Amino acid sequence: LGPMPKKAFEHLERAISNEWAEDLISSWNNAGWWKLPQTLGELIAPVVGAASGQIIVSDSTSLNLYKTVYAALALSEGRNVLVSESESFPTNLYILEGITSAQQNIQRRLVGIDGDSLEELLDDNVAVVTFSHVNYRTGELLPIEELVKKTHEAGALFILDTCHSAGVLPVELDKWGVDFAVGCTYKYLNGGPGSPAYLYVAKRHQQVALNPLSGWWGHASPFAFEKDFQAAEGILRFQTGTQPILSLRGLQAGIEIAQTVDLQMVRKKSQRLTQLFIELVERRCGNYEVALQSPTDPEKRGSQVSFHCLNGFSIIQALIARKIIADFR
């Protein structure tokens, strides 16, 4: 969980004291509530290397992964295999498992279980490949542009999870040729606990890709209250239901900060800090069976460092008691 931006309090106070308490329903238009998912998506776009009109802030990462996998499957007629990493964040695997359980003809293959590499698992049956930019447990940074190229050469679509990279590493969704992407906002984008996630759909897919969770916010004319669903144009069709306005307001400050920094400089500083941390831990804790789990090469490591040790949870609690915030996994 990222730290709270100073302006987040101002945004939330205004949303509660003025927009909600005084203006009530008129704030959907006057305060821009209705367009917040789109407005914030436009702010996130340059942070992850996306052109305008390709990102919407909406729902959770899990729901957005479900939407994008289903959409990608529908675009891959005649193919029925999903490929992911066995070491992916568990919710990603659960979503894929749920899809394969609901559709008996869809199969799942995992790198690390069904094969040692993506190349081993790619064939004419593969519809979708979904990988994380940075491994949630080890911090390993994957060569996404290379993986996307191999995926496309096999005729499949690529979905990228940017949860552990957006806002702290250079991300180039358009340049890399990613088809769909998802990401959370409460880590390096400092959106606060439970802040909404985001979803990216490359412009080339938007007129044919369909959201499987068709709700009124994704309707072409939501206030016409028509009986039948007609998808909105472009990225807006990937909205589903009413969004959490207060959480969106809190998120805005964090994204605005991310827009003002040079992520190449952030990356370099992160590499120096993580390298220093590794060296200090190995120097001072070498006799306590502490083993580095992250790559030693800073170019292959994200912005996190992971160590394995006995009684890890107790150690983390002791650190927290001393106001040193760490995470146990």
Role assignments for model-derived ranges:
Residues 1-329:
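Pyridoxal 5′-phosphate
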